[in-house]
Amino acid sequence: MKNLISILTASVLLLCCTGNTIHFGSSDEIPANTVLLLELNKGVSQQQLSEACNFLKENFPALKIVKGGKVQLPSSCYNGKRYRADSILRYLDQIKPDSVSKVIGITSSDISSTRTLIRKGKKMTYPDYGILGLGRRPGTVCVVSNHRMGGNAATFSKTVLHEFMHTLGVRHCTHEKCIMQDGNGSGKNMRESTHVHKECLAIAMEGLD
C-alpha cells in the first residue's frame, strides 16, 4: 500500500482535463511504460481503484501508474441505455496524451458491446450486451466497468488486468483458472480465476518492450 500511495501522490505528473484534451502540468520526462488511469463519469471507489493499481503492479512491477482526473463521457458514447464500450475506446484514443503508453478508463456506468455467443447450441448475436470490460488487442486503450460486479473488488482488479493485457497483445487463454480466459458472456470465469498463465505473461512482457 505504501508503494501505491507514493505512485499515486508523487508530483511526478500533474494532470488536468480541459474539454477533450488532457494536459500534463509538469514538463518532467514521462517514464517509459506509464499507464494513465482515468475515472469516467462517476468512477469507482478509491479503495477499488487502489486495489486494482496494486494488482497491476504485482504482475507488472515495471509499470508507472498515474492517476488522472475524472472525465465525463460524451453523449455520443451513450445509446440511451448503456455506454458503448467501442465508442468509449475511440474517445479515449482521442484524449490520450502522446506521452503515456496506455490509458485505462474506469467507470461504474453500465457498458456494452455487440457480442455473438453460443446459447443452447446456437449462435446468438446481441447488439447491446452488457459487459465488464473491453480492450484493444493490441492497442493503447481499454475500459472496465464495475457495474455488473456486485461490489466484488477482486473481480474488478482481475478485469482491469485482463483488459490491460489485451492491449499488450494477449489473446484469450484456454488454461483453466487463468485471468485471460474468455468470459463467454458471464463473469463466472473471472470470479473463479486465480492467476495469469505463464504463456500469457510471457506474451504480455514482450508487449511491454
What are these regions (language model features)?
Residues 146-209:
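The catalytic-center signature of Zn2+-dependent metalloproteases
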Residues 2-10:
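Sec-dependent signal peptide recognition
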Residues 31-44:
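Fold-level signature of zinc-dependent metallopeptidase catalytic domains
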Residues 15-16:
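C-terminal motif of bacterial Sec signal peptides marking the signal peptidase cleavage site
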Residues 46-159, 171:
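Metzincin-family zinc-dependent endopeptidase catalytic domain
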Residues 40, 107-109, 183:
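Short loop/turn motifs enriched for small/polar and acidic residues
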Residues 20-29:
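Sec-dependent signal peptide cleavage junction
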Residues 10, 120-122, 194-196:
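Short intrinsically disordered coil segments
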